[in-house]
């Protein structure tokens, strides 16, 4: 920088695009093995998908930290009956603590 006031040309030295970058991928894959692996992965995903479909919905609980009163979010996946039990516990003596206060003890 020369002088008391910085100017834009002092900071922009060279704006020349690089055209020499090779964007071609020279990697070669064995296609028959990849297809076999894809089929195995697909078969393994089917039972997991069925389990996900049977699972209960996810609920987001927002409350305040019992120590610093910052926002605490808790994601819960449960049945309606068990969610009511959690609600009763939170309305009672169970209180949530934010991660920052939990590390302070």
Swiss-Prot record:
Annotated region (Disordered), positions in chain: 30-53
Record field: transmembrane: none
Gene3D superfamilies cross-referenced by the UniProt entry: 3.30.160.330
Keyword vocabulary terms for this entry: Activator, DNA-binding, Early protein, G1/S host cell cycle checkpoint dysregulation by virus, Host cytoplasm, Host nucleus, Host-virus interaction, Inhibition of host innate immune response by virus, Inhibition of host interferon signaling pathway by virus, Interferon antiviral system evasion, Metal-binding, Modulation of host cell cycle by virus, Oncogene, Transcription, Transcription regulation, Viral immunoevasion, Zinc, Zinc-finger
UniProt KW DNA repair keyword: no
Motif (LXCXE motif): 23-27
UniProt PTM: Highly phosphorylated.
This protein's GO CC annotations: host cell cytoplasm; host cell nucleus
Zinc finger (unnamed) in chain: 65-101
The family this protein is said to belong to: Belongs to the papillomaviridae E7 protein family.
Protein name stated in the entry: Protein E7
Species assigned in the record: Human papillomavirus type 53
């Amino acid at each position: 920088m020369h002088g008391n006031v910085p100017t834009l040309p002092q900071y922009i030295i060279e704006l020349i695009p690089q055209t020499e970058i090779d964007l071609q991928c020279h990697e070669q894959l064995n296609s028959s093995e990849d297809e076999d692996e894809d089929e195995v992965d697909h078969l393994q995903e089917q039972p997991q998908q069925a389990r996900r479909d049977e699972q209960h919905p996810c609920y987001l609980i927002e409350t305040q930290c019992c120590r610093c009163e910052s926002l605490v979010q808790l994601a819960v996946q449960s049945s309606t009956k068990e969610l009511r039990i959690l609600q009763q516990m939170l309305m009672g003596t169970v209180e949530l603590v934010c991660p920052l206060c939990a590390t302070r003890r």
